[in-house]
Amino acid sequence: MNSKTLSSWMLMAGPIVFFVVIMVLWSALIGEGETAAEDVANMIDNQTMAAILVMVGSIGFVSIFIGYALTAWSRADGSTTEGTLASVASLIFAGIAAISMGFTGAHFGVIGGGEEDAVESAWVMAVANNTFPAVFWFWALGNIVLGAALFIEKRINNIGSLLLILWGVLVVLMHFTVEIEDFPRVIGMIIFMGMMVVTIVFGFFNLKSESVSTGKSEA
């Protein structure tokens, strides 16, 4: 298995695993709280199941960014415009992957903390929950930079690269709505789900794309 195949399957499987585990099973088996304290209480009430879902869900979520990082890294080359952009994108996605490992992994401390550490756990959950906007901000920037690199390179279907750019721009624009108190939540959810769908579609195009030879490994 080469890096292109591995990254493509990560990009296709990661969003599906994350959606099924966190958006469906978590809501059904653990429950969504209105506050961080309620989230902690729900996890403490279902410690074993919560731990299992965090294990699987975190792997799916982090796999998305590792897949993007591998795709960008395989094209990293400081001697060309597209290679330089790919280098920047690889660093962005590697950083997001590291942050995602941190805040998804923090859930294990909350789950194992029990009721005696409920107050501290609520603070941890509040920080973890508020990390998502930062992740999506840099995810959008990474998509735009990587999409631009791939569009210039022309080794992958332009639909894939343009989708990265388009949805990246949409997420950037959504960050300008922070002052709108009654901004429809459904719009944000549609854009979020769109990011997941775009990732799956891009993974498919990447799998079918022309292989890249960089002297490091086959993309």
Regions found by a protein language model. Give the residues of each.
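Hydrophobic, aromatic-enriched alpha-helical segments typical of multi-pass transmembrane helices
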Residues: 1-219
